Amino acid sequence: MFSGLHTSKYACQVVVQIRTATKRAAGSRTSMKDSAGRRLGPKKYEGQDVKPGEIIMRQRGTKFYPGENVKIGRDHTIYAVEPGVVRYYLDPFHPYRKFIGVALSRDMKLPKPHFEPNVRRFGRIELDNPKAIAKEENALSRKEYLSRDTLLKDLTEREAKRHEMMDNYWNFISSELKLNIIPERKEMASNYLLRYRTGLKNGFDLQEAQFNAKYYLQQMLKLKAKRKEWNEEKLSEQLHNLDETTALLNKSVSFSNKWVIIPYISEEEKLTRKDELIKKLTELGTAIKSKSDKKAVLELFKDASHFLTQAQEVRLRRQFMKPVQPEIMNVNVAEKADKKTTVIRRFNYEKSKIDIIPRTKTAFFKRL
């Protein structure tokens, strides 16, 4: 522990002890003395209440094993991890072991049946007092309380936007398409279309979006029937109305790849219109040389979102509406640079120098 003593040659000698990190020499802990006991044994008995962290048993070795809602430390100390009641018990699956556990309620016995799920609190207790229930329902975290005004404002704006969208959908199917849907089913039809659009926007395909929208409304009707105590006949009637409404909407209404409501287009018609679009674009070619060419291409893509998926439309736009056209001499590459050209500098690896390429405005799609 001490590597040595250093003394001075002067009259007033100072002893300096140098301590190093060497391991202490082995020896008896008690040095042959009768030391105090370690206070082993039970600290909590059968039926006593415990809090998390309270020690139940101190022991040398595992005389008792940890059961439910307790843990064992490195010195074999058993302590509670949940508030409850101490139970000493035997487990028929381990006949030679004695267990200590914590029951979550006083009427609960251990061990529980072996194949039953564990009883857990999930950090919650049941409230019986109406005042406490109301207080808990209205309670907000600090973060929610500080941002309450912003949250309420955003919620109000979302609800207003949702209702506006539902009104627009109803006007579209009643005024433009003139579907035979009675006004009493306005909310049902609008809600279905809103859910249908949300499913498409979240990445579902057509059938999945339709199924999820209808399933949601079916479950809401069943909950409403349970809440308002409808009889079976009334619930069946409402579900039948939902089936009729959704079937009519599915064959009358669709959405573009920008999630705008449009009249229904069959898969065969979509393929036909796609082939026609590709044919017309091929006739125009990829080299757009004038403003009229640009206008013609944009006109072709005007309704493309109705029958193309977003990926298909992006692919065709990249193919036929290149932001920078390929270099063609005397078409979009000038002989010399001037005020009307855009100079592009490119390193030429063969000649080890920078080439200066003057491009005309016809080389850039946005400048046409």
Curated annotation (Swiss-Prot):
One annotated GO molecular function: structural constituent of ribosome
Tell me the GO BP annotations in alphabetical order.
mitochondrial cytochrome c oxidase assembly; translation
Ranges of Basic and acidic residues composition bias in the record: 31-44
Q: Which PROSITE patterns match?
A: RIBOSOMAL_L27 (PS00831)
Where does the record place the region Disordered? 23-44
Cellular component terms (Gene Ontology) = mitochondrial large ribosomal subunit
> Where does this protein reside within or beyond the cell?
Mitochondrion
Q: What's in the keyword line of the UniProt record?
A: Mitochondrion, Ribonucleoprotein, Ribosomal protein, Transit peptide
The residue span given for the transit peptide is: 1-20
Annotated signal sequence is none
PANTHER family according to UniProt: LARGE RIBOSOMAL SUBUNIT PROTEIN BL27M, RIBOSOMAL PROTEIN L27
Record's protein name: Large ribosomal subunit protein bL27m
Organism listed in the record = Candida glabrata (strain ATCC 2001 / BCRC 20586 / JCM 3761 / NBRC 0622 / NRRL Y-65 / CBS 138) (Yeast)
Q: What is the lineage of its organism?
A: Eukaryota, Fungi, Dikarya, Ascomycota, Saccharomycotina
